[in-house]
Amino acid sequence: MTVHFPFQNSYVALPDNFFARVAPTPVAAPRLIKLNRPLAEELGLNPAELETPEGAEILAGKTVPEGAEPIAMAYAGHQFGHFVPQLGDGRAVLLGEVVDRNGVRRDIQLKGSGPTPFSRRGDGRAALGPVLREYIVSEAMAALGIPTTRSLAAVVTGEQVYRGTALPGAVLTRVATSHIRVGTFQYFAARQDVEAVRRLADHVIGRHYPDLAGTERPYHALLAAVISRQAKLIADWLLVGFIHGVMNTDNTSVSGETIDYGPCAFMDAYDPKQVFSSIDEFGRYAFANQPRIAMWNLTRLAECLLPLFGDDKDQAIKEAETALDGFAAQFTEAHQAGLRRKLGLFTQRDGDQPLAQALFDAMALAKADFTLTFRRLSDAAGSGDLSVVRALFEDPTGFDEWAARWQQRLAVEPQTPAERRAAMRKVNPAFIPRNHRIEAVITAAVENDDYAPFEELHAVLAKPYDDQPDRADYAEPPQPEERVLQTFCGT
């Protein structure tokens, strides 16, 4: 059977130094373990074709579909603050682009498809565990309503990869509105190739910000637009307790999507200094640091764009600084608006931010679970019964003091308790991809070739705001012996 991909490839029309043409490396015995049928249909693909052996071969990189022009993209990046002038797709191949049913151009990339000219002595492969982690978490983020790359398919290769021990190999088919990163701009800026920076900026404007084309100062507007999307994205992360774990500039998408999940994790007990990533030794990318790091990354983007702002360097710097100054205000506005919604506040008052901070302080002191605290507050807002929330706090004294202030604040809101409860439940999920659940899924798949736990967790996370009483245990935090203290990149 022929598997049809309606490719329309634009990135390969850019100069040859933007990428390396490279085909995926064939694998021994590809087997499809998960296809995202709704996403396939959204992309204009036929799920029935993709579920055939021929489809599995394409999704594993064993064969290249008609119309594909496989490439590895060039980029640089700051990794934990240290600049690396050449990174690039070291284990991923962009097959091409399709225009989805909403008219949006989307990349289709194979991750773990073999070595490329950018592999830096790596084998270009992916182990099954990291593939399942990214599939679960990226699709959970999409269900939560957070901009993200998507997962179209996961395939085991029939081969082993070696990461200290032998592990099953796998390939993830990742979908993104593009894979252009801050580090892509840095790649050309580091080479003082201003014309390439301009070509890339024009491409990004045409693809992601078409309203800016033809404006008087399109490159200034591009920087401002990327800043706005990143400010909103980071606010979204913090509102669900998400920790990216490796916020390097090469993992910062100019489209405003979450990308490169690696050692990501969701908080259980609230701790603003929480770090899970095993490689984040000094807490650079800790939960509460994420807005500051996003601002740092955007400053690196601004540096790349400065030559496009005009010949007066001092004036260009001032204009870039003005744009960057907008990040803090936009992040704060998005974050505080989100916190008001999470607390059931429909109007804005001066004391709202201190009220939210007081709850976080009480949660940190008493090690209360982040997700369950807000979910149970949603129900308490309807019933008035705070006991289910109190039970989450080792010492509820701080919570009791806060709850009295919260109830006073709710008293001046116009909504009924039932309206408030319904609104809060739409923004306070019951289910997140908890770390111990993900680890259990990976263990079952890697050790026993058992994907039933993966399927069940994925199904639960597809409806994060629903109660799902028959799956209530998935909402619970880990027992002490189940806690995951570190996550790993897997590369």
Curated annotation (Swiss-Prot):
Domain of life of the source: Bacteria
Ligand binding (ATP): G88, G90, R91, K111, D123, G124, R174, R181, D260
Cofactor dependence: Mg(2+); Mn(2+)
EC number(s) reported in the record: 2.7.7.-, 2.7.7.108
Stretch list, region Disordered: 466-491
Keywords from the UniProt entry: ATP-binding, Magnesium, Manganese, Metal-binding, Nucleotide-binding, Nucleotidyltransferase, Transferase
Class of enzymatic activity (EC top level): transferase
Bias (Basic and acidic residues): 466-484
A molecular function (GO) term: magnesium ion binding
Catalytic activity: L-seryl-[protein] + ATP = 3-O-(5'-adenylyl)-L-seryl-[protein] + diphosphate; L-threonyl-[protein] + ATP = 3-O-(5'-adenylyl)-L-threonyl-[protein] + diphosphate; L-tyrosyl-[protein] + ATP = O-(5'-adenylyl)-L-tyrosyl-[protein] + diphosphate; L-histidyl-[protein] + UTP = N(tele)-(5'-uridylyl)-L-histidyl-[protein] + diphosphate
Positions annotated to bind Mg(2+): N251, D260
Active site: D250 (proton acceptor)
Stated family: Belongs to the SELO family.
Function: Nucleotidyltransferase involved in the post-translational modification of proteins. It can catalyze the addition of adenosine monophosphate (AMP) or uridine monophosphate (UMP) to a protein, resulting in modifications known as AMPylation and UMPylation.
Cross-referenced NCBIfam families: PRK00029.1
Name of the protein this chain belongs to: Protein nucleotidyltransferase YdiU
Organism: Bradyrhizobium sp. (strain ORS 278)
